[in-house]
Amino acid sequence: MRNRAVLFGLFFIGYSSCVFHATPTRASLVENPDVESTHVEQWDSNGKRLLQVDGPKRILAEERGMSEGILPAAEAVEKTKVSEKAVPRASLGSKLNPMTWPKRILHKLKLWYARFLHWLLRKATVDEKTIDRSMMNGLTPSNLKRVKNDILHYSSSVPHDKIEIETDYDSYVEHFFGQFKGLDKDPPVFEMDKWNNLEKEMTKAEGYLKRRALNTVSRNIDKGLSNEQLISLDVSPFVYMRLLEKRGVFKDVENNKDKIDQLKDYIKAYKEHLMVEQ
């Protein structure tokens, strides 16, 4: 019995060694593509071991398929990481950024202030008589233009009353410069009665504004400033003409031609400057 057991053990060892050396490995299949087939180990869903006859081409295809499947997945992961980094968490221009709040508040305040001024100017330019009162109080086209530009500039979008703003401005400018047509006649004509009667109808507040405008223009004219300097100070050509009328220039045209010519030159320069800045 002992001899039989030894012989059986030797037989089992020798048979196992032969089977082991006769079965080609995966590496040997790649190095020796002439091998016809091999047993490729596989497992089913239940965990049972299966044997499948396959060749080296299938093995290479499986390895290539694994590499082709892994690389795109890795690239997709990298792209996903890059895209996440590219998404801005807090933009500098975002409304939620506290750094932009002071600028936005200042922008809103300027817009409200400009609209308030426009409301006041609309009240001052309702009709021709109201425009005349505003002109006597020193309101110039440049004042109205600055308010118009402020509203258009500080609005986050085009204001719905843009056409109305432009219409108010154009009508005021046309009426304003229409008052100087009589200066080109010989002798120059100035409607003194119209403005004197309007002056009598003014309230105390309007009378104060009228006197202040005349005093301001009088100081600048008496300094002998040039047209460019007067324009920079926004001296009203209409108040300038009213000042000359108050001083009796139009009653003695022959002796005051130089003053009237200076007024006409200033009106021309003022209008050209206004049109250039449109």
UniProtKB/Swiss-Prot annotation:
Major place of residence: secreted
Motif (RxLR-dEER): 49-64
Top-level division of the source organism's lineage: Eukaryota
Keyword terms, alphabetized: Host endoplasmic reticulum, Host membrane, Membrane, Secreted, Signal, Virulence
Transmembrane segments: none
GO cellular component: extracellular region; host cell endoplasmic reticulum membrane; membrane
Transmembrane helix found in the keyword field: no
First and last residue of the signal peptide: 1-18
Subcellular location: Secreted; Host endoplasmic reticulum membrane
Domain notes: The RxLR-dEER motif acts to carry the protein into the host cell cytoplasm through binding to cell surface phosphatidylinositol-3-phosphate.
Similarity comment: Belongs to the RxLR effector family.
Function (record text): Secreted effector that completely suppresses the host cell death induced by cell death-inducing proteins.
Protein name: Secreted RxLR effector protein 151
Species this chain originates from: Plasmopara viticola
